[in-house]
Amino acid sequence: MLCNFIYALHSCSPDYIMRILTFKFSLFLSFRGKSYATLHIGFSLHHSTIIGENSCPVLLSVTLSLHSFTLYTIGSAPLVSTPRTSQPSSLPVGMNNAFSFNFL
């Protein structure tokens, strides 16, 4: 998987790589600060940008798989979009629905 990820980075445009790196950086900051609302908003903003881009399908699939794996195995606190949580959500319904997809 790592080889495919590195190969896809070489075949992408610099603008596309910067959007991916910005997305991964905001994901890391959100988990460190346990600010799940920031994580969800950051992902939904980059989600439409990544899906609309057709130049790097391999990088897209690897990024979404890693993101989904991280979300569902973190286990430190329930995420706002998980159906099992009993906490009230502070996000709009559309953003919660964006996280109900399984990318794996």
UniProtKB/Swiss-Prot annotation:
Source organism superkingdom: Viruses
Protein name: Uncharacterized protein ORF104a
